[in-house]
Amino acid sequence: MEWMKIDQVAKRSGLTKRTIRFYEEIGLIPAPKRTDGGVRLYSEDDMEELEKVISTKEVLGFSLQELQHFMETSRQLELNKEGYLLSLDPKERKEKLEEIQETLNHQLDLIDEKIRTFQSFKERLQGMKGKAERAIQSIE
């Protein structure tokens, strides 16, 4: 397995080293392996997890708190999926599927709330644009 130091991860992700350390500190990404000297070593899996955080933040426009919550539910979803795949008991598999469904509903609720916020902001901007257009017309 090939390991990357934080400089390489920062360059590849487009984030600063400080941001990567902060994401680790607040639990957005798992703590990487460390050398005996304390140097962080990141695997390709760590990089993929960081890329998930970045894309979720960029696409959904979540605050750090919302992002933490969303990523935690994503991790819970993965655990439930693993539990479902490992179980042979139909009752247990059904319970895992219900937990997966509940987690997905929660994530969809978070996204719906963000969409409502964007829609409200868009409506305010459209109102301001309309006022500006009317003001221009009244001057002409």
From Swiss-Prot:
GO MF: DNA binding; DNA-binding transcription factor activity
GO biological process: negative regulation of DNA-templated transcription
Pfam families given in the database record: MerR_1
Residues in the DNA-binding region annotation: 6-25
SUPFAM superfamilies: Putative DNA-binding domain
Disulfide pairings: none
Protein name: HTH-type transcriptional regulator YfmP
Gene: yfmP
